[in-house]
């Protein structure tokens, strides 16, 4: 992995009681040893694979102002990280769920792009076997489940300050409160809405195939084409490029897909991140609620699966063998 650490700082927030978070600040930067480099590479890999929200700094953002001064050489990275950890403590202290943790600031370069990663990591307890084959307790950083994470694309921020996607963050497993306090700390607001862009793309594809007067099989083939392209981009860590997608759909209509999307006003960006859960709707129907979970291939609608909107009834002809076996055993038992 072509990842080079420029500077990295680590501090700690310790929760002493319900009201107080204690600051433990390092007096020096971490050395980019092999172990540290391996940890940052793992953080980068895990974070890059997750669905993220996009944001941008507000004009009043204290973090952005301090970061700008640091980038201009008016403050060193360690001082910047120490002051930022203090501001994070002040924000966290407002929330009863605050637990503290290790606060990491890492300025690194990956594939010619500079990033600043800010995250709060926690230790987990586990067991290990030592050289004498004894079992001893141990601790490790829970990188895979870190949810207080943000990353600033410094290259994008400095070369294209009007961008709405230079800052990314995770919304967190415990709901909106995590996102709220972290956004307050960052002094940021939500920017590009990747889910909305993907939903707009799906609607544009459906309308595009309808206007081209394609039959059911042809429409599904187009959806599969779109899904294949978008999934390839997702797997490669690349964004959906409307122009490239339009070339994939050449021949579907006399009008190109990009021209169609622009004329109809879908407000799609020239490129935007793929959203896995939204894109699945191109090839599958899925839903759950009231103790019922249903998931089936889109091509089955109208063939083996029929929906009556008047009665909101779904009729399935031919059940999966394992489901049929369970139903037979349950009904025969009664």
UniProtKB/Swiss-Prot annotation:
Sorted UniProt keywords: Cytoplasm
Gene Ontology MF annotations: double-stranded DNA binding; single-stranded RNA binding
Gene Ontology CC: one annotated term: bacterial nucleoid
Protein location: Cytoplasm, Nucleoid
Cytoplasm as UniProt keyword: yes
Cytoplasm in keyword set: yes
One protein family per Pfam: NA37
Top-level taxon: Bacteria
Similarity comment text for this entry: Belongs to the YejK family.
Annotated protein name in UniProt: Nucleoid-associated protein YejK
